[in-house]
Amino acid sequence: MANFAHRFIVSAALTAAVWLVVQLQPSPASAQECGGDCCENCDGGGDGSSSAPPITPPVTGADSSAGSINDLGKQRFNQMITHRVLGTVLLGVNEQVNCSDCVSAFGSAGSFSAGIHGRKELTPNLSLLAGIAYTQYSEGGYHVTSAPIGAFALRYDFTDWGPSRPFFDIGTILSPSENVRYRRSYVTSLGPVSVDGQTSSQNYGAYGRAGWINRISPRDEVAASVEVWQLWQRVKGYSDPTVAFNPFDATIATGTDKTNLVKVGGQWTHLFADNVEGNINGGFVQSFANHSGLVATVTGSDGTVAPTIGNQSWFEYGGRLGLRIAKGWVADLFVNGTAGPQPVGNTIHGGVGLRVNY
């Protein structure tokens, strides 16, 4: 009897153990249904909740976007200088100081330009220099897509002093309506961004020049001079255009850029044989009292951003080769440009002209 009871207890215990194991083992259907994503007793808690989604880091690049405003300031300074260089062509920068009345039609490349300029003797000592042109030019990220330019000046030449004598100029260059596009580029944690802002601008310049001319021979004229300029450039406010990705966009307020220049230069004009004219000119330019009117509001930056343009220096050069094709008619090939560090940089503008002397 005791043995029977012992065997019964052992048998019952084994049966209970087998039943428990079977109950705890998941069925193939439930395992397939779970798909390995069930988590009833995971470390995250026994309530079956899923893991939290990954955290996306914020996009960075606000500092780079604010820094791009400094580049805009450099573009606007370069625009003022290029406008002046193109305007001086209308004032006869590539021609001799003293010559007969003339009119010249011209076209240029490097910066597209087409126009007409000339000079008229008002008295034996006083001459009027004037010209108008339509131009398009670009440099370092900006594009002036349409710009009429006008210029005029008065020159007083002390001809009664003889072949070596002083002369004085006073004049202006103006462009009251320009269409311009400025490029702003910066870098974010998700990649680079580049946007072009479209707006309009106005450019004005006034100058005075004092120099000395010497007709050292019937074929040669040399001159040295000092010029003082003041330039103004007013740019209408605008905002970045709507693009697919520009997380740190900017708004530019209306403002006026200003600079003052002093140029010390010289020139030489020579007649080769009887029908070829040559002129070379150049000078050193120093800017001072520069002021940038650019003020920008940039998303992600505290307050406003305003660049500072320090004093700049560079060289300017020019030249002309003229062929006397008929009595009073001259075909000209000319070039003008700048050489120096940014924001002025190295630029070149060349063209051809047809001049008539009368």
Task: Identify the residue ranges that each predicted region occupies.
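Extended hydrophobic secondary-structure segments that form protein cores and membrane-embedded regions
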Residues: 168-171, 224-228, 280-282
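Cleavable N-terminal export/targeting peptides
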Residues: 1-64
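Short, aromatic- and cysteine-enriched interfacial helices/patches
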Residues: 37-42, 161-163, 216-217
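Outer membrane beta-barrel translocator domains of Type V secretion systems
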Residues: 57-214, 336, 342-343, 347-355
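Outer-membrane beta-barrel porins/channels
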Residues: 204-216, 223-231, 241-242, 267, ...
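Extracellular/periplasm-exposed beta-strand and loop segments of Gram-negative cell-envelope proteins
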Residues: 106-107, 132, 136-145, 176-204, ...
